[in-house]
């Protein structure tokens, strides 16, 4: 079961003026569940995005990247679950284009103004006719307050829908931010089997929106890992309708931009943490903090060496304080000039190791008590600089194997 995720209620997800969402049931993988989401955007909405760095990226990623960098404003997004349209060659590209073209005809825009997204099984042909046939159904229930249904429609192996809203004041104007995401397995930085859609009604220029999505991603979705597998389909899309009524934000030094950046990053980080908390088979949520490094990059290397380790993740599942595994991971993280005698390792607030070995004050029963909790914090102090980073992961349980062994059945 998900680790400490409060139940999401529809009224918690606030509408964004200028944006509507509609869902449909197309039976792409199985009948009786929402598996198509359409998002329509008002004119003058600005859109920015980041995508997977997997070289075997899916057809919709290729098409979405192309459309997003084109000269025409984006007017709609179409997302399907149950089929990734990845590893499908030219026919996959053709199917992604056909989906965009069909939606464009229905809403009266150009094909290049639609962004396609898919998630599901790889190397199976996209059932494009099912999707096209059910687009009118999705358009028929378009509504600005349909965020909860949208969060349900993009789920695959997720157990719970994921969404969050925040409101901030910018120079006396209320600005709303709402986001949804899906993801449970194949979660790894740059990015993952993760789809995220965040929208705001703030007025902000396109270059700043591009900066915002990259900044938020680096501090959220690129700070999580479930199993170390990088997906073919992941994307994070940030949309700004500009209908809040605030004075348009045009420079990054504007306090309004700093406030908006912090709020969007908070929403992205909460969504990313929900993905880890709902990790396939997860029973524990693990925070890995690495401090006092020379650079953020070396802190990140150490953090991911720990967070990716199957030995550490299974020890967390078993509540086994076999903490030498953490020291080993720090050692193979690739920090060439690391002085291990300076490194300090904490489990929660308990000092576990220092001076190259076990701390004199550490007692195994204290370690086990912390490991038995549903939330575990592992802290590493490199004591060689002022940089730091935080990464979130989960444990590795028997159910992870079962879920993925049964994925296509």
UniProtKB/Swiss-Prot annotation:
Question: Which is one Pfam family of this protein?
Answer: ArgJ
The annotated active site, in chain numbering, is 193
Site (described: Cleavage):
192-193
Catalysed reaction(s)?
N(2)-acetyl-L-ornithine + L-glutamate = N-acetyl-L-glutamate + L-ornithine; L-glutamate + acetyl-CoA = N-acetyl-L-glutamate + CoA + H(+)
Keyword list (alphabetical) reads: Acyltransferase, Amino-acid biosynthesis, Arginine biosynthesis, Autocatalytic cleavage, Cytoplasm, Multifunctional enzyme, Transferase
What pathway is this protein a component of? Answer: Amino-acid biosynthesis; L-arginine biosynthesis; L-ornithine and N-acetyl-L-glutamate from L-glutamate and N(2)-acetyl-L-ornithine (cyclic): step 1/1; Amino-acid biosynthesis; L-arginine biosynthesis; N(2)-acetyl-L-ornithine from L-glutamate: step 1/4
- Which residues does the annotation say bind substrate? 156, 182, 193, 280, 404, 409
State the function annotated in the UniProt record.
Catalyzes two activities which are involved in the cyclic version of arginine biosynthesis: the synthesis of N-acetylglutamate from glutamate and acetyl-CoA as the acetyl donor, and of ornithine by transacetylation between N(2)-acetylornithine and glutamate.
Q: Quaternary state and partners of this protein?
A: Heterotetramer of two alpha and two beta chains.
Name this protein carries in UniProt: Arginine biosynthesis bifunctional protein ArgJ
Q: Which organism is it from?
A: Nitrosomonas europaea (strain ATCC 19718 / CIP 103999 / KCTC 2705 / NBRC 14298)
